[in-house]
């Protein structure tokens, strides 16, 4: 759904040192969105545009804080 490259572009990161951290934050953000939205993988895919925005927002929040 959301790739590491999309996260890096969203956060304006162009170096690779934080890739492991970003991948971890991406997984956490996806789980948060699924939990808060009470969705499974299939439902997340049905609402892909909204879920993508929510996941990117969550990754950004986790990265900055």
Place the predicted regions along the sequence by residue.
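Divalent metal-cofactor coordination and adjacent catalytic microenvironments
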Residues: 1-65
């Amino acid at each position: 759904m959301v790739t590491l490259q999309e996260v890096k572009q969203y956060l304006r990161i162009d170096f690779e040192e934080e890739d492991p951290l970003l991948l971890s934050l991406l997984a956490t953000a996806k789980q948060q969105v699924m939990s808060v939205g009470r969705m499974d993988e299939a439902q997340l895919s049905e609402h892909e545009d909204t879920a993508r925005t929510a996941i990117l927002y969550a990754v950004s929040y986790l990265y900055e804080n």
